[in-house]
Amino acid sequence: MSADANIKTIMSVYEAFGRGDVAAILDAVTDDVDWAAEAAGAAAPWYGVRHGKDGVAAFFAEFGSTMEVEEFTPVSIAANDTDVLSVVRFRAQSRATGKTAAMDLHHYFAFRDGKIAYYRGTEDTAQTRATLQT
């Protein structure tokens, strides 16, 4: 796939996330996708490595049951024929504590046959931990 096609796929995934359309996100990943929000420790239920579409669905279910997104704005995207890197301005409120986290997220996607085969996301884990703690 071309860099432009890969960016288009990521933007459609981001738009699906904004709508809460996990099925559309799952359509964009390979059956054996390797998906992870990288973090030391388990401060948030969505942290850790997931495999396959069921793992990605669990990631979004855990995230959605924990956080209410207030802002998710891609601010920079770079791509080539196999990879996409993005920076996303993010703000969300913990459903349990009412505390808000605001940060930039960093996403790396690797493509295979036009679909996302690998994802790694990083965030301010200390801020996430503080937001989720009661």
Q: Language-model features: where?
A:
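A beta-strand edge to alpha-helix "cap/lid" segment located at domain peripheries
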Residues: 1-5, 61-134
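Short, low-complexity N-terminal intrinsically disordered segments enriched in polar/charged residues
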Residues: 1-31, 131-134
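A structural signal for well-ordered alpha-helical scaffolds and beta->alpha junctions
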Residues: 3, 18, 22, 53-56, ...
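Hydrophobic alpha-helical core bundles mediating ligand binding, dimerization, or RNAP-core interactions
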Residues: 10, 14-17, 29, 37, ...
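Hydrophobic pocket/interface hotspot
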Residues: 10-13, 25-26, 33, 52, ...
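Short, mixed-charge, low-aromatic patches
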Residues: 11-20, 43-47, 63-67, 87-89
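Short glycine/serine/threonine-biased micro-segments
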Residues: 18, 50, 96
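A solvent-exposed, acidic/Ser-Thr-rich amphipathic alpha-helical stretch
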Residues: 24, 30-82
